[in-house]
Regions:
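Active-site-proximal loop/turn and secondary-structure-junction residues that shape catalytic pockets
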Residues: 41, 66-68, 101-104, 137-141, ...
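Active-site acidic/histidine proton-transfer and metal-coordination neighborhood
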Residues: 10-19, 25-29, 51, 85-97, ...
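Charged helix-capping and loop-helix junction motifs
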Residues: 77-81, 111-118, 146-157, 209-215, ...
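Glycine-rich, proline-tolerant flexible connector loops at the mouths of alpha/beta enzymes
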Residues: 65-83, 140-144
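Hydrophobic faces of well-ordered beta-strands that scaffold small-molecule active sites
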Residues: 33-38, 62-64, 95-100, 133-135, ...
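Short amphipathic alpha-helices and their capping/turn segments at secondary-structure boundaries
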Residues: 51-55, 78-90, 119-127, 211-216, ...
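Histidine-acidic metal/acid-base catalytic patches
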Residues: 2-34, 43-57, 179-285
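A generic structural signal for short coil/turn motifs at secondary-structure boundaries
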Residues: 71-74, 107-108, 144, 232-236, ...
Length: 285
């Protein structure tokens, strides 16, 4: 593993405390923005092959799925966690994030099974060296025009937030809601461990002024960012990435940018993501 790959793995997957002083002595600098991609965008959700693909693309990390429709346990199993850590080490690619996309079909707002998933995701995040856990609120878990569902989520997050706080893990809400609606939920929970997982494309599709929303939410309420397009390569669709870059700079955001979607119809994933990675690095780095 070369020096650059060592840094990637250290940041994404975590190394022992013994290794950290060594890195400090080497004065390795973590870049302001690190570039990852969702495992479900570069292959099937929950596939360990995502690390090898990410290496081919030139990514710094992979946002991995906690579980899948076929395997509700998956990364909640310590043995599976170790196989992922080994795969990340072999590829020289880190863990850029953790996501519970299965909540879209088995909703957190109403299905009690998901309480354990969210609680376990905090432990998994710690094991993988991940800071943020994406909680997905789309499809069956949509919070729009659902005050009862929103209140249920607030109550659940209030209950689990202390565990996340103790672990130093943030639970990120990704939904169709506007910035003010997200703020209302976050303020009601009242925990630094619950923030917005901001998707620039989803919010654009909803007609929100994403540049204003990013600035209004600020770095204290945005835990992480999806850089996404639907049916276009990045930089060729609806989202003005140069303005996104400026807005994120204005709020002093530092952290992962996760590429999602952004494959034109009929095009292959690998060349599309090589192009997407080049575009994002050209703008943000």
């Amino acid at each position: 593993m070369n020096r650059r790959d060592l840094l990637r793995y250290t940041v994404g997957a975590g190394l022992s405390a013994v290794s950290l002083p060594m890195l400090a002595r080497q004065r390795l600098i973590i870049p302001r923005y690190r570039i990852g991609a969702c495992d479900w965008s570069i292959g099937p959700a929950g596939s360990i092959d995502a690390f090898a693909v990410a290496k081919q693309i030139g990514l710094d990390g992979v946002q991995v799925s906690l579980n899948t429709a076929a395997d509700h346990e998956h990364l909640r199993n310590p043995a599976t966690q170790q196989t992922y850590i080994d795969a990340a080490r072999k590829a020289g690619v880190g863990f850029s994030g953790l996501a519970i996309g299965l909540l879209n079909g088995i909703p957190y707002k109403s299905d009690p099974r998901t309480d354990e998933w969210v609680a376990d995701s905090i432990d998994v995040a710690q094991a993988l060296g991940v800071k943020n856990v994406l909680l997905a609120f789309f499809s069956e878990n949509d919070l729009r025009n659902d005050k009862a569902g929103q209140q249920a989520v607030i109550d659940k997050l209030k209950a689990i937030a202390p565990k996340a706080e103790r672990a130093g893990v943030v639970l990120g809400i990704e939904s169709w809601l506007s910035a003010p609606e997200h703020v209302a939920i976050i303020d009601a929970v009242g925990s630094s461990a619950v923030k917005v997982y901001y998707d620039v494309c989803n919010s654009t599709v909803r007609g929100y002024d994403i540049f204003r929303e990013i600035r209004d939410l600020g770095k204290d309420r945005i835990c992480e960012v999806h850089i996404k397009e639907n049916g276009h390569l990045l930089g060729q669709g609806q989202v003005d990435l140069n303005k996104v870059h400026q807005a994120l700079n204005d709020i002093d955001y530092k952290g992962w940018l996760q590429i999602e979607g952004a494959v034109p119809p009929g095009q292959e994933v690998l060349p599309s993501y090589i192009a997407n990675n080049k575009t994002v690095r050209g703008i943000f780095q």
